[in-house]
């Protein structure tokens, strides 16, 4: 029986790995072991509960005001004992987090094969996003299995000289997650507050946007909200104190926006399904929103998901106040522009990525 250890520690990782945990645990020929690092503690626990995933190991590395040094050393030191005790045949990591980087590095040190879920995303700038672009490139170097979500991701890996035999195009596992979480009968008091209005969903927390860039982003959003009485915004805010301070400074007193605590994945996906459009500097939502027909304004200068830009469902607007203001206003005031972005083919898969990954791992 093949033993597979899945390691993850943040909310985005959990959303994309929990459906894979469920798929692998349904396979008799695979023993599935789950280790969470707790890089994002409370938000991680929400996802685990939603998917009824109980981890076998919890490293609990999160601490107040943690740095990249803290997370990297905490995961490296904690995962070593798990790897030595379990002796897995394969270690699976997801995406581009510090957890993924450190766990893959630890597996490499012990000569354990690494599988990388969502491999091949690239901006080619290791400081944008930071540190995610470096993390995912580093994981690819040590991976024996590269599960690329799209053909473009595969081409990125081939361009770097990766062995074609290690690359498998599977689609993105977040689409699998949406099949579980989005529900027709869902209700929530915040959605009732926005009933009859066009709902804008905001997510913003990116490390490189902290400070003045985020202030510009928020000012643009507030200007648009002040000019459109039929629009309401909901911002499930990140726990980073720097994000909260800037949001309070810019949005304070504006009755058209509700700043709420982070949502669990079931709530978030259902808010997303009922939104009019999304403004974000996040990565994963660039995949989730197109699957639900929602236009996305990406408040970043680069994206590792060019498929959405090419398909027309994502638009890069950077962090300049005027650019965000103009694009946001256009989608609210120009019905043709909105329709063009909201009716595009989803480039990120068909909801069967987990099955494909499990088939590959079981067949090796």
For the regions a protein language model found, what residue spans apply to each?
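Nucleotide-activated sugar donor-binding and catalytic core shared by glycosyltransferases
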Residues: 1-235, 242-364
């Amino acid at each position: 029986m093949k033993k597979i250890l899945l390691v993850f520690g943040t909310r985005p990782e959990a959303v994309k790995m929990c459906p894979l945990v469920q798929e692998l645990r349904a396979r008799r020929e695979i023993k599935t072991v789950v280790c969470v690092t707790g890089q994002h503690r409370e938000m991680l626990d929400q996802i685990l509960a939603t998917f009824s995933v109980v981890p076998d190991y919890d490293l609990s590395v999160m601490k107040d005001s943690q740095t990249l040094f803290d997370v990297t050393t905490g995961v490296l030191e904690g995962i070593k004992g798990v790897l030595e005790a379990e002796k897995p045949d394969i270690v699976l990591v997801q995406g581009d987090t510090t957890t993924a980087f450190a766990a893959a590095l630890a597996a490499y040190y012990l000569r354990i094969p690494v599988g990388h879920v969502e491999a091949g995303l690239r901006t080619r700038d290791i400081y944008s996003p930071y540190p995610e672009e470096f993390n995912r490139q580093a994981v690819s170097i040590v991976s024996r299995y590269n599960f690329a979500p799209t053909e473009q991701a595969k081409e990125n890996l081939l361009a770097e000289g990766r062995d074609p035999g290690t690359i498998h195009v599977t689609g993105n596992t977040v689409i699998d997650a949406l099949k579980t979480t989005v529900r027709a009968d869902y209700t929530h008091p915040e959605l009732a507050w926005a009933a009859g209005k066009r709902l804008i969903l905001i997510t913003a927390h990116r490390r490189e946007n902290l400070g003045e860039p985020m202030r510009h982003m928020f000012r643009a959003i507030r200007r648009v909200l002040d000019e459109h009485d039929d629009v309401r915004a909901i911002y499930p805010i990140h726990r980073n104190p720097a994000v909260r301070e800037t949001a309070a400074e810019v949005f304070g007193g504006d009755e058209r926006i509700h700043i709420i605590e982070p949502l669990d994945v079931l709530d978030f996906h259902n808010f997303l399904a009922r939104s009019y459009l999304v403004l974000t500097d996040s990565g994963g939502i660039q995949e989730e929103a197109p699957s639900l027909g929602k236009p996305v304004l990406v408040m970043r200068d680069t994206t590792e998901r060019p498929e959405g830009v090419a398909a027309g469902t994502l638009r890069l607007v950077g962090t300049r106040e005027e650019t965000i203001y103009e694009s946001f206003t256009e989608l609210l005031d120009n019905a043709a522009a909105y329709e063009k972005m909201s009716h595009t083919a989803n480039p990120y898969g068909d909801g069967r990525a987990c099955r494909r990954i499990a088939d590959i791992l079981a067949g090796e």
